[in-house]
């Protein structure tokens, strides 16, 4: 399958145009792809009809590649409205800049329909390079969105270099000319005289062709009639087809009939004037490229507001090399360069003193400190390695201290994965632009987490910002549970890729060692990992790299036309030195490791390759091999029909059902009608007419109001007295589960059975107290399905949110964005924020427990006899916090607003393997974390 898919992406051998209609249909199918399938590929051993891939020019000198091509819709939204109305733009993204290449393809399709037929013929003859958009078809050449503002005249200098001239060409002139040995179509059809240099006639460069310099114009020719072609101009393209002296005759011979043809010329004098400018342009390139892509039109405002916030990252040395005092000699790197960060930079001596003094006094390394700057509290995290110190400072109101400690560990892990060590990253001057780019994205994620979420839904942005406090630094990847048959299909596709025993990847194909060994791969869809064949350590490091470079939120929306990343990496799992204690343990080969990431639409496929060992040894700085890129891209093309089934799993996740916190805040009886007809309940309950009837309405929780109670950590709730006009059948949700069960079972309703079936489809319960009324009427099978969906104990569902971390496999599961968006509600959104911040603090206790357990294990190994050391506190394995909340906008001053209580509980499991569970549920029931964890973790495998 992979071989067939790959064959479609290769260039076709030249053939004479047959049925043009069939060819046009065939080409239109290829052009309808998202931009990635239309790109050709090539290899050194392939035929000369293959075309260079578009990303080849973006490979850096050190072999790295970061190429991003947006989808057509996103390309249009990237430029101002005045330009997007008439242009379709292609974006070429490298490590240092984003370049928009404008193209008048829309107008050309309308005004020049004959050109399409001409283009199809050229494609069928493999004369049309797939990168023909590189030359701008408008008067504006390539424009960098990083170097110009939208209000500036971005094409002033480029207009002097390129110009488009439309001329009329009639191939029928050839029939009027007597047959001669050599007919120069450039002179006969266009009227341009080009004299080939004698040194080119028998030169090896003749195969690549010579630049078509205009040496003269034929009187009466099309070029002279246009009045725009001058002697000295260079013809670079015909209808966006790159031409040289080698292929100009073949390109002109493909013109089917009389038509208008666009000629692109380059002014030779402008080329000479701009030869000295490339180095200056590189120096002016910005490091905010991905931020502009992610934030869109708000990029400038976001970046300006970010720079006004005091934040900094510094890499300092503790040992000065010379006695002579030199200003800032201890600073090896710092970012950003702004007025707000300058104040933090000026007090770096305090950080150095604390790091040195506390370690000498206490014997432990300093991890964090706090200071006040202009009335704002700033947290600073420390990470010391040998005689170097990494510092990251962020405002306390934006980033809590436990999160900052996790963030600096995550940054250090990612930089070591990219460069091998912190010294290699910060002490090499050529890495400075890449580090600026890295920390630019890092601070944007830290200070504006909601801005980088590409969904237009405000609830999704709020959830992304609230959950980033905890989820972004968990030692795991967000996992999406899939059905077994779908999981097998994904596993098969990745296994076929990793086998690498077909076509060019086979050693028998060239009778030589393959270049790389594929160690494994991981597949992401919309930021969720759906399949992985990599060890836990590799998965965590690769996911951290993608997260730090904002690739996961980028793939969450269909913005990727094609993404190709190639770089050498240093995975800790493979490069750690072997232990001397076990000589029979597996020894990793001495090789080099490379990461290949290919993105297409919502997919992101990460492949880890090894050079050395079974494969050939890598020398120098190898760039990406086109064959491997094609095979990975072909694997993604095989999954084109799978994305719809994954979308179904996102919409109806098989995870446990959730309840909305707003449902538990009772409204007055006179407001019950408005609550039961709210968009949230109507969307989840469906078009049930009985939901608004009086007999059914009394079963809604909104008809029952709480009896106001003082804040208390007690989990024993009291009943309430029925208010005037209400039936005494109403229950307080703080009543015991037995009382709820007895009274609910006495109120049966056939309508609730249909509601339960609807809830199974939507994976969220419309109202937690709307389902228990008819449990005795459900069949045994329906009860079993209901119990599987409901994680909490008791007759009703009281689960609000959860996070389950499986540290052995490096994954965690949590409700999807779609599930949280369905619940909505102002109280529930605040609950989500409180949940993640509280879990962050609870996990800090668990991390301390794990450190103590490791120390205990080491001490037990060194001392066979039990030690008499007594710890002041027992290891924390379960921790809970009780919250109470009331409606924000409570207008009835005569009545006390209702109060809802909920618990946030975290549980650490050390045996049989480390696991962490965090749940949020209503105070009306008592939950056992072990039972909930068993339901969540049972059968959870990669």
From Swiss-Prot:
Biased composition (Polar residues): 137-156
Domain PDZ, first and last residues per copy: 185-267
Molecular function in Gene Ontology: phosphatidylinositol binding
Cited InterPro entries: CCZ1/INTU/HSP4_longin_1, CCZ1/INTU/HSP4_longin_3, CCZ1/INTU_longin_2, INTU, PDZ, PDZ_sf
GO terms under cellular component: cell surface; centriole; ciliary basal body; ciliary transition zone; cilium; cytoplasm; cytosol; intracellular membrane-bounded organelle
Pfam family, one: Intu_longin_1
Biological processes, Gene Ontology terms: cell division; cilium assembly; embryonic digit morphogenesis; establishment of planar polarity; hair follicle morphogenesis; intraciliary transport; keratinocyte differentiation; limb development
Tissue: Widely expressed in E8.5 and E9.5 wild type embryos. Present in various adult organs (at protein level).
Effects seen without this gene: Embryos die at midgestation. Embryos exhibit multiple defects including neural tube closure defects, abnormal dorsal/ventral patterning of the central nervous system and abnormal anterior-posterior patterning of the limbs resulting in severe polydactyly. Fewer and shorter cilia are present in mutant embryos. In mice lacking both Intu and Fuz, the lack of convergent extension and more severe patterning defects in Intu and Fuz mutants does not result from a functional redundancy between these proteins.
Residue numbers carrying Phosphoserine: 674, 678
Composition bias type Low complexity, residue spans: 33-48
Region (Disordered): 1-56, 128-156, 707-751
Subcellular location, record wording: Cytoplasm; Cell surface; Cytoplasm, Cytoskeleton, Cilium basal body; Cytoplasm, Cytoskeleton, Microtubule organizing center, Centrosome, Centriole
Bias kind Acidic residues: ranges: 22-32
UniProt keyword annotations, A-Z: Cell projection, Cilium biogenesis/degradation, Cytoplasm, Cytoskeleton, Developmental protein, Phosphoprotein
Domain of life: Eukaryota
Protein purpose: Plays a key role in ciliogenesis and embryonic development. Regulator of cilia formation by controlling the organization of the apical actin cytoskeleton and the positioning of the basal bodies at the apical cell surface, which in turn is essential for the normal orientation of elongating ciliary microtubules. Plays a key role in definition of cell polarity via its role in ciliogenesis but not via conversion extension. Has an indirect effect on hedgehog signaling.
Subunit note: Component of the CPLANE (ciliogenesis and planar polarity effectors) complex, composed of INTU, FUZ and WDPCP. Interacts with CPLANE1. Interacts with NPHP4 and DAAM1; INTU is mediating the interaction between NPHP4 and DAAM1.
Protein name: Protein inturned
Lineage: Eukaryota, Metazoa, Chordata, Craniata, Vertebrata
């Amino acid at each position: 399958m992979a071989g067939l898919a790959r064959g479609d992406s290769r260039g076709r051998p030249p053939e004479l145009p047959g049925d043009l209609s069939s060819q046009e249909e065939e080409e239109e199918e290829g052009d309808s792809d998202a931009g990635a399938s239309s790109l050709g590929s090539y290899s050194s051993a392939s035929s000369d009809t293959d075309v260079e891939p578009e990303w080849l020019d973006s490979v850096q000198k050190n072999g790295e590649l970061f190429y991003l091509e947006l989808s057509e819709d996103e390309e249009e939204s990237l430029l101002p409205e005045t330009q997007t109305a008439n242009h379709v733009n292609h974006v070429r993204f490298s490590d240092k800049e984003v370049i928009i290449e404008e193209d008048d393809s829309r107008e050309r399709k309308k005004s020049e329909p004959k050109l399409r037929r001409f283009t199809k013929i050229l494609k069928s003859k493999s004369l049309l390079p797939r990168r023909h958009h590189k030359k701008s078809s408008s008067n504006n050449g390539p424009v960098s969105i990083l170097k110009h503002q939208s209000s500036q005249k971005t094409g002033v200098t480029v207009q002097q270099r390129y110009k488009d001239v439309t001329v009329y060409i009639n191939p029928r002139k050839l029939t009027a000319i007597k047959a001669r040995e050599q007919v120069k179509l450039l002179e006969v059809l266009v009227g341009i005289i080009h004299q080939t240099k004698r040194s080119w006639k028998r030169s090896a460069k003749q195969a690549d062709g010579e630049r078509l310099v205009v040496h003269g114009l034929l009187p009466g020719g099309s070029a002279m009639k246009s009045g725009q072609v001058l002697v000295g101009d260079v013809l670079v393209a015909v209808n966006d087809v790159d031409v040289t002296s080698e292929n100009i005759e073949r390109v002109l011979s493909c013109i089917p009939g009389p038509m208008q043809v666009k000629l692109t010329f380059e002014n030779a004098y402008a080329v000479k004037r701009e030869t000295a400018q490339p180095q200056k342009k590189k120096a002016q390139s910005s490091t905010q490229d991905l931020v502009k892509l992610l934030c869109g039109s708000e990029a400038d405002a976001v970046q300006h507001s970010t720079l006004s916030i005091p934040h900094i990252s510094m890499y300092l040395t503790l040992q000065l090399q010379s006695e002579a005092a030199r200003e800032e000699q201890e600073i090896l790197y710092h970012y950003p360069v702004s007025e707000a960060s300058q104040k933090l930079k000026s007090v770096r001596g305090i950080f150095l003193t604390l790091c040195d003094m506390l370690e000498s006094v206490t014997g432990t390394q300093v991890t964090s400190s706090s200071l006040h700057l202009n009335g704002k509290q700033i947290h600073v995290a420390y990470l010391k390695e040998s005689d170097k110190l990494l510092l990251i400072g962020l405002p306390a109101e934006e980033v809590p201290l436990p999160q900052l400690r996790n963030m600096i560990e995550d940054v250090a892990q990612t930089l070591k994965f990219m460069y091998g060590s912190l010294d290699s990253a910060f002490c090499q001057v050529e890495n400075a632009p890449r580090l600026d780019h890295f920390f630019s994205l890092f601070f944007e994620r830290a200070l504006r987490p909601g801005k980088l979420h590409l969904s237009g839904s405000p609830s999704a942005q709020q959830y992304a910002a609230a959950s980033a406090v905890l989820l972004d630094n968990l030692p795991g990847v967000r996992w999406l549970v899939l059905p077994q048959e779908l999981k097998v299909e994904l596993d098969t596709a990745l296994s076929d890729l990793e086998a690498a025993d077909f076509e060019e990847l086979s050693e028998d194909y060239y009778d030589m060692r393959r270049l790389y060994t594929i160690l494994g791969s991981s597949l992401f869809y919309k930021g969720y990992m759906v399949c992985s064949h990599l060890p836990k350590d590799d998965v965590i490091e690769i996911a951290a790299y993608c997260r730090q470079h904002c690739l996961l939120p980028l793939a969450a929306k269909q913005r990727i036309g094609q993404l190709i990343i190639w770089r050498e990496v240093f995975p800790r799992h493979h490069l750690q030195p072997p232990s001397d204690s076990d000589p029979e343990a597996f020894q990793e080969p001495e090789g080099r490791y490379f990461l290949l990431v290919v993105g297409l639409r919502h997919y992101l496929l990460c492949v880890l390759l090894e050079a050395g060992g079974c494969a050939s040894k890598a020398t120098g700085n190898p760039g990406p091999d086109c064959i491997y890129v094609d095979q990975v891209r072909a694997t993604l093309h095989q999954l084109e029909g799978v994305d719809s089934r994954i979308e179904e799993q996102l919409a109806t996740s098989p995870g446990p059902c959730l309840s909305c916190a707003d449902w538990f805040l009772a409204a007055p009886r006179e407001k019950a009608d408005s609550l039961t007809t709210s968009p949230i309940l109507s969307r989840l309950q469906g078009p049930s007419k009985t939901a608004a009837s009086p007999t059914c309405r009394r079963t809604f929780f909104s008809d029952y109001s709480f009896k106001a109670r003082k804040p208390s950590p007690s989990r024993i709730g009291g009943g309430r007295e029925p208010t005037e006009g209400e039936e005494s059948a109403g229950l307080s949700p703080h009543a015991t589960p037995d009382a709820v069960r007895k009274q609910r079972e006495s109120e049966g309703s056939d309508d609730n059975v249909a509601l339960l079936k609807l809830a199974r489809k939507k994976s969220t319960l419309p109202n937690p107290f709307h389902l228990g009324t008819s449990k005795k009427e459900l069949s045994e099978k329906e009860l079993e399905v209901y119990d599987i969906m409901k994680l909490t104990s008791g007759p009703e569902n009281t689960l609000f949110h959860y996070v389950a971390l499986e540290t052995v496999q490096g994954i965690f599961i949590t409700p999807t964005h779609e599930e949280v968006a369905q619940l909505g509600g102002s109280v529930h959104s605040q609950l989500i924020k409180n949940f993640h911040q509280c879990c962050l603090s609870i996990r800090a206790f668990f991390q301390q427990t794990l450190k103590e357990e490791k120390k205990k294990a080491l001490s037990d190994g060194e001392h066979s006899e039990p030690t008499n050391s007594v710890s002041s506190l027992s290891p924390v394995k379960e921790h809970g916090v009780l919250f109470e909340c009331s409606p924000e906008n409570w207008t009835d001053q005569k009545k006390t607003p209702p109060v809802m209580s909920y618990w946030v509980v975290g549980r650490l499991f050390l045996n049989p393997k480390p696991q962490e569970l965090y749940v949020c549920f209503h105070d009306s029931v008592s939950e056992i974390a072990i039972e909930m964890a068993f339901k969540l973790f049972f059968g959870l495998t990669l």
